[in-house]
């Protein structure tokens, strides 16, 4: 939910996460896994977040250096090599970060404890 929290300026987003978003937006490329967008679509339909899927896409399009990483065979192969038990969408998000050699902005304890990818929170 960190992307939604960043877009909505939610107080649950940590200061380190805000700094990571802002730093990457200024000086790099922010990779948004397709699995994150699928999760946003799913939870927004259930009323669990304040931002709709369409609003999320519109906000992403406002930034020049946001790249949506597709869920392709490379991500699936990377996910298949992850031995740690986690929910499928989390595994796909971690696999995307691994494939693109990117840090992951998340507060998910299971992902952090797995130690598979560099996490910012």
Which residues does each predicted region cover?
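ABC-type ATPase nucleotide-binding domain
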Residues: 43
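Active-site neighborhoods of divalent-metal-dependent phosphate/nucleic-acid chemistry enzymes
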Residues: 51-52, 63-109
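Active-site-proximal loop/turn and secondary-structure-junction residues that shape catalytic pockets
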Residues: 36
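Short, well-structured N-terminal submotif of metal-dependent ribonuclease cores
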Residues: 1-32, 46-59, 100, 109-110, ...
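Short glycine/serine/threonine-enriched helix-capping/active-site loop
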Residues: 32-33, 71
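Short, structured coil segments at secondary-structure junctions
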Residues: 64, 114-115
């Amino acid at each position: 939910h960190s992307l939604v929290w960043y877009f909505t300026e939610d107080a649950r987003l940590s200061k380190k996460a805000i700094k990571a978003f802002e730093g990457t937006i200024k000086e790099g490329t922010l990779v948004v896994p397709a699995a994150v967008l699928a999760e946003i679509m799913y939870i927004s339909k259930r009323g669990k977040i304040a931002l709709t899927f369409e609003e999320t896409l519109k906000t992403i399009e406002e930034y020049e250096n946001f790249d949506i990483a597709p869920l392709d065979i490379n991500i699936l192969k990377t996910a298949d090599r992850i031995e740690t038990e986690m929910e499928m969408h989390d595994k796909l998000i971690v696999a995307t970060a691994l494939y693109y050699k990117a840090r992951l902005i998340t507060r998910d304890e299971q992902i952090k404890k797995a130690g598979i990818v560099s996490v910012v929170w």
